[in-house]
Regions:
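A mature extracytoplasmic/lumenal domain signature
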Residues: 30-32, 84, 180
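Conserved SGNH/GDSL esterase-like catalytic core that processes O-acyl groups on lipids
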Residues: 42-139, 213
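Alpha-helical cap/lid subdomain in secreted, periplasmic
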Residues: 22, 101-233
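Short, electropositive, low-hydrophobicity segments enriched in small/polar residues
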Residues: 34-36, 91, 132, 222
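N-terminal secretory targeting modules
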Residues: 1-63, 72-74, 116-118, 170, ...
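Generic detector of intrinsically disordered, low-complexity, polar/charged segments
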Residues: 11-14, 20, 27, 84, ...
Length: 233
């Protein structure tokens, strides 16, 4: 009898342990839209969303209001790593800010940070917005043999990033989230390159924003549109 009780206890502990760990883990490679104070890695990454925000910039004041936290919480997932950096571009060319040349964003670009996403089950890449806003060079479609110079243009940097990620993160679900309201050249480039690498592209629509960034309502819309896309697969 005692052996039977012990065996049952071992089985229950094992089942509960598996259940507790069964939720998929999620990593985010993003820009300001996916930041929140205290929830990005490395901690030195610049953030847009704070727990005491400027009301002129946003009405988001809790991490629970961000699109990714809502998505993770609603689906029983776990956060692996959020490597988002406000103002970051996919390529290495950043904002001119009154200067004649593009700023060198190699220290914060997606194509640099793509190596640091942990070991997740799902990765969301949410970028391209700052490349569009900064007017970064669009470049040509190029699917191999990238040079350092190539990575200062959007198309080759985007291709390099996806090529690297499907090899660095095998058997991981990778999705690209495309913001609404961007130039058609960026939209077409993202869809074409995602198609080449067979990366699903979630195209957002009608996102509510304050100062160009998702509001609380917009964050919920993003979460819902991501969920709708995934449920249809």
């Amino acid at each position: 009898m005692r052996k039977a009780i012990i065996s049952l206890w071992v089985v229950l502990v094992g089942v509960l342990g598996v259940s507790a760990q069964s939720g998929k883990s999620v990593s985010i490679l993003g820009d300001s839209y996916s930041t929140f104070q205290g929830y990005v890695q490395p901690e030195t990454n610049v953030v847009w969303y704070w727990d005491s925000p400027d009301a002129q910039n946003t009405d988001v004041h809790s991490v629970r209001e961000t699109w990714w936290h809502q998505f993770i919480l609603k689906n029983g997932y776990r956060l692996c790593l959020n490597n988002s950096f406000s103002g970051s571009t996919v390529c290495n060319s950043g904002y001119k800010r009154g200067n004649p040349d593009f700023a060198d964003y190699t220290d914060r670009s997606f194509v640099t940070r793509m190596t640091n996403l942990g070991c997740p089950d799902i990765i969301f890449i949410f970028g391209g917005t700052n490349d569009a806003w900064a007017g970064s060079p669009i470049g040509e479609y190029k699917y191999g043999g990238w040079t350092k110079e190539d990575l200062f243009s959007f198309r080759p940097a985007m291709a390099k990033m996806l090529d690297f990620m499907i090899n660095r993160y095998p058997n991981v679900e990778i999705y690209f989230i495309l913001n609404d309201g961007l130039q058609e050249e960026i939209n077409e480039s993202v869809k074409t390159i995602c198609g080449h690498y067979q990366i699903p592209c979630i195209v957002l629509d009608g996102i509510d924003k304050i100062n160009g960034h998702p509001s609380i309502k917009g964050m919920t819309q993003i979460c819902e549109q991501v969920e709708t896309f995934l449920s249809g697969r």
